[in-house]
Amino acid sequence: MARTMRSRVVAGAVACAMSIAPFAGTTAVMTLATTHAAMAATAPADGYAATRYPIILVHGLSGTDKYAGVVEYWYGIQEDLQQNGATVYVANLSGFQSDDGANGRGEQLLAYVKTVLAATGATKVNLVGHSQGGLTSRYVAAVAPDLVASVTTIGTPHRGSEFADFVQNVLAYDPTGLSSSVIAAFVNVFGILTSSSHNTNQDALAALQTLTTARAATYNQNYPSAGLGAPGSCQTGAPTETVGGNTHLLYSWAGTAIQPTLSVFGITGATDTSTVPLVDLANVLDPSTLALFGTGTVMINRGSGQNDGLVSKCSALYGKVLSTSYKWNHLDEINQLLGVRGAYAEDPVAVIRTHANRLKLAGV
């Protein structure tokens, strides 16, 4: 009976990951050059978001540039930035993979950065990463600091995720390891099918381990950044860093829609501050709203404090923290699902547009 219950919990966790999966395709130099020319021809005169260097949007776990080549991961965001004068590209990396190593997302992103630079003639890029995409962006900033002007992370688990710890612990109840293998195979196939390029470089177990709190601590040792606060603290670090003579501007923000409430018999309740209780349409039209409320409640009962359903406030702190008060869950941060969000949630498209202007005014 207990094993059956644990299996259901694991299945639920996987289903949750599928329901909240955000979407990204590596583009050839010729295609990028054509796109760059088209954007330059249509950029508005005022150039509110016209940064000096190109912006690359970097997706997180389970992502791609467009799910199945149709639904944008950064829903409506690339188009809005382009309409306001920005030169914007969207990376397409493995949806399920670690960030370091030869097959990792970091090396994939580095190759894409070089492709964008070759297509545009720029010398640097501004990296904007959501969720795991922030860790991937930090990798590139660490190993190729001369190619990066700024790193912005949105809802990134710099200290890992308590929900990843929870899933790993549940899987560990199976002494045979069969559950992990079967579920990982299923998730890997999901990653291949939803990738716009049907990328076969998928490793769900490596991705899960990357996002645990223990592995995040190791990652931070291997790829340190001045933007990180002291280990174990709920503090951010410096707003800039200089690596090999190259200065990077560092920014972050996050949603904290899931807030702890009262504790009864050792169990802490939670509330979703982004929605109107019972009547909010987001609960009906966006299945990820309730799913992330559930995962966020699990996190709170594992000591995370306020969170977005997958990443805690403390874990998301990095560089100059612009806000941790947005009433967003993890998908609201990228305007998912399909632009539906709770009645109290701010507009993420406007927030990212404003940040592009901030980068412009900072000279990058």
Swiss-Prot record:
The entry's localization annotation reads: Secreted
A GO CC annotation recorded here is:
extracellular region
The active site of this protein is located at: S131, D308, H330
Q: Which InterPro entries match?
A: AB_hydrolase_1, AB_hydrolase_fold
Q: Which residues form the AB hydrolase-1 domain?
A: 54-333
Leader sequence range is 1-44
Write down the PROSITE patterns for this protein, in alphabetical order. LIPASE_SER (PS00120)
Q: What is the protein's major site of localization?
A: secreted
| Subunit field text | Monomer.
Tell me the protein family, please: Belongs to the AB hydrolase superfamily. Pseudomonas lipase family.
Q: Summarize the protein's role.
A: Catalyzes the hydrolysis of triacylglycerol.
This chain belongs to which protein, by name?
Answer: Triacylglycerol lipase
Organism encoding this protein: Pseudomonas sp. (strain KWI-56)
The taxonomic lineage of its organism, from the top, reads:
Bacteria, Pseudomonadati, Pseudomonadota
